Amino acid sequence: MASISDDGMALSGYLKKLKTMKKKFFVLYEETSHSAARLEYYDSEKKFLQRAEPKRVIYLKNCFNINRRLDTKHRFVIVLSSRDGGFGIVLENENDLRKWLDKLLVLQRNIANSNGTAHSPYDQVWQVVIQKKGISEKVGITGTYHCCLTSKSLTFVCIGPEKTPNGEDRVASIEILLTTIRRCGHASPQCIFYVELGRQSVLGSGDLWMETDNAAVATNMHNTILSAMSAKTESNTNLINVYQNRPDLSHEPMRKRSSSANEASKPINVNVIQNSQNSLEFRSCSSPHNYGFGRERCDSLPTRNGTLSESSNQTYFGSNHGLRSNTISGNRPHSTNKHSNSPTFTMPLRCSESEESSISVEESDDNGSYSHYRLNTRTSETAIPEENIDDFASAEFSKVTEPNESDENYIPMTPINPTDAIHEKEKIDMQRLEDASLHFDFPEHASEKLAKDYDLDSDNQCVRPIRAYSIGNKVEHLKFNKRLGHLNDTGQNPNRVRAYSVGSKSKIPRCDLQRVVLVEDNKHEFVANRSQSSITKEGSGYGTSGNRQKKSTSAPLLSLKNQINSDRMSDLMEIDFSQASNLEKQKFIKNNEIPKYIENVFPKTPRTDSSSLTLHATSQKDIFNGTKLNNTANTSEDGYLEMKPVGNAYTPSSNCLPIKVEKLKLSDYTAPLTTAAPVHDLNKISTYNISAEKWREQTTSEEKKSNSPLNEKPFSLKPTNVENISHDVHSTNNIDCEQVSVQSDKQNNLDDKIVENNNLDIGGHEEKKLVHSISSEDYTQIKDKSNDFTKFNEAGYKILQIKSDSSLISSKLYQKGIHKDNLERSHRLTESVNTIPDNATASSSVTKFNINAKAADSRSTDPSTPQNILQIKDLNFPSRSSSRISQPELHYASLDLPHCSGQNPAKYLKRGSRESPPVSACPEDGNTYAKIDFDQSDSSSSSSNIFNT
């Protein structure tokens, strides 16, 4: 080392350049009368002694900052920053570092004092290259700059010329307050550091992207700037007031800075992955200038509560007041949270919720005394507890109610059992005393709104903590219940009220409607509206009378409304598994529905008693009077709802026959008929597959009708070719069919019998129905005059009974083979017609057969009797379970054949309509019965045996 000479040399020696790490001979000169303070270096000491030209001269007056640098891999580095760039010196040890750094700083201060300028050194200076990205190009900050950090601002100083090679101006120097920085981060692989500025900054809102020498510099910039943003000092607290010429308010704490950024403004290309513990240890010894840092400040990201690792492990003096860790990089061990032993503060150190900021940020110097509570800045009298109420321990807000307070704060996870009445009463009284001390004063809310939040009557509060509501939340819920008229029910019920979806409280189950409306009001007629899936009573509004049977539910049902909205039940299907009070009434209600296609034919006006629905097996009057139906099936399954498909379900014998028999119209045998589907075979037929035991019940009614005198004249029809005339009938039934057409002018006053086919599998868009021919004039007359069905003289036949010979095979009702077959084919109705062309003459006939009308008993019919049988060839009959039955099965149909007449049948029977007109027949008139044998044993060569009865 050379001593101070006459030319002002202060220090000299061999040091290393930071950039090349080569040893050079450095000489430091003080300011003299004929030279300025400067730093020179030579290649060697020999050249210095030879008075050679120095390799570089750095004047201290041009250096705006001289400090120690810690972001390099070398420990002892001094950097001199000037407008020409930065120059780094690497020393051997700490003593040399202190000696050279102190001498340089003394000389720099002397220069500032001589010039009359205040010297404000920077804590950290980094040399960066600002990229043309974000707002940098717009404001003119591009190229190489010094990034200088102080406790209150971040300054960018231009390096090099103030004009770019393109002639654009560059900003020489600009200072950005730390309070206007939203957030910062770095990308390690790309050596990129960025800063996001807010709207209150000098440059406006935007991002500044800068490139550093290496990734270590970018990491150090991020940690150091973030620590400065999170520090708390009195000077930085009152910085805004000083800049705006306001009085110094250092004795009053400044509101903690909350973030104005949200998650959407985060750059997604910034990946910061580093060890939290290493970064904390690295920052704890960053710079001696950091000793003055103390301002607590939340960073610009949406942040969270401070943890133990961010408070005690990040301190410089070992106190509880420390620096925040990097919120981007760093783990947050929440499990290490512990209550602080420090005394409670009257003024909370955490950033509270404010009206100015959209995102509230919470920071604290203590280790979580208020970690589970938020203090509302609008009032200082109470705090709203959140979920972790058992962790709250504060002398200001906690109230000691009983000695065993720890037992009350414990929340059991077992099902809550109701406590005794005395303990419950004590808790309610204690809670009312606490509620009396609560006072809320909001300009837009009444004081009693939040006072009702601690009402124990609304919920079952055995040992559970009180639920925290937002402002006005529960009050609006109570107002809604009051408008609905349920306030008294919920207030008197200590249990938890069942939660309903929107509009579900006004829904009444369909089973309750059937039970209440249809069974009790038994003197009215009912129409099942399938479009709305509800049952309504004709001539009256929607309403229920009587008591509802309470269903088994997990929560108490709320009271029902008197008015029922049918639209709300349009998308609801409920299944009632409860025991029915009267099984027979329930079965009648189930089978009393009218098909939709029958409702469309008749007008929806009130019907007279003459046109009302009648039953075949039993009458409606007998059911309402309490008459028991003959039920041969086992009744052990009463009340159980069969979940099998309707077509395959086995029902008791009382429900085997259809309750209503559809009116069938006899078309003109001289007019062509339209078919339900394109006919590929000559003769098609439809049958009823009905169990054998049902026919045993119907023998008495058939015997009575068979005794009536028959005056029918036999007639014959000649066989002709069969044509398929019309293919445009909208139906998709694949069932072979045959229709016999007979002309008649006899007026029949029989009761209407409607066949309801509930068990057919619908293969198309419209339901299967018996197809008949009716003129368009008759259809118009029916629509206009639907209440009078007895005005027309119509010819037709009615299928009174259909009997299978399965009842003749064996005397047992429940034989195994027959039971399986009847179980599969019960309630199946196949309907269709056979097309008969018109030959334009009344003498032409379709099928040749003889019908000799005479009275006979249906029970004595034997399929083996061959008298008066005409074979009809080329018939295809549907057979579903022909493999199960080894012997032929015959089906008999009792037909009501009215008297033939010479009147023109075209007056009433015409082509072109498929609806069944109303037929009124008198049971007192003489009827003709014929039994037709439909043989299903052989599908290839089937026959039809017609018996003259």
UniProtKB/Swiss-Prot annotation:
> Keyword set for this entry?
Differentiation, Growth regulation, Oogenesis, Phosphoprotein, Repeat
Q: What are its GO cellular component terms?
A: cytoplasm; cytosol; intracellular membrane-bounded organelle; nucleus; plasma membrane
Q: Per the record, which residues fall in region Disordered? A: 247-270, 304-373, 530-556, 696-718, 906-949
Motif interval(s): YXXM motif 1: 410-413
Q: Which residues carry this modification: Phosphotyrosine?
A: 410, 892, 929
Where are the compositionally biased (Basic and acidic residues) regions? 696-706
SMART domains this protein is in? IRS, PH, PTBI
Disulfide-bonded cysteines: none
Please give the Gene Ontology molecular function terms for this protein.
insulin receptor binding; insulin-like growth factor receptor binding; phosphatidylinositol 3-kinase binding
Where is each IRS-type PTB domain found? 122-236
**What superkingdom heads the lineage?**
Eukaryota
- InterPro entries registered for this protein in UniProt: IRS, IRS_PTB, PH-like_dom_sf, PH_domain
Q: Where is the composition biased (Polar residues)?
A: 304-345
Regions of compositional bias (Low complexity) in chain numbering: 937-949
Gene Ontology biological-process entries: insulin receptor signaling pathway; insulin-like growth factor receptor signaling pathway; oogenesis; vitellogenesis
Which residues in this protein are found as Phosphoserine? 286-287, 342, 554, 913, 916
UniProt-listed Pfam families: IRS
List where the motif YXXM motif 2 lies.
Answer: 640-643
All residue ranges annotated as the PH domain in the record: 8-109
User: Quaternary form?
Assistant: Bindings to phosphatidylinositol 3-kinase and SHP2.
Role of this protein: Activates phosphatidylinositol 3-kinase when bound to the regulatory p85 subunit. May mediate the control of various cellular processes by insulin-like peptides. When phosphorylated by the insulin receptor binds specifically to various cellular proteins containing SH2 domains. Involved in control of cell proliferation, cell size, and body and organ growth throughout development. Also has a role in a signaling pathway controlling the physiological response required to endure periods of low nutrient conditions.
> Under which name does UniProt file this protein?
Insulin receptor substrate 1
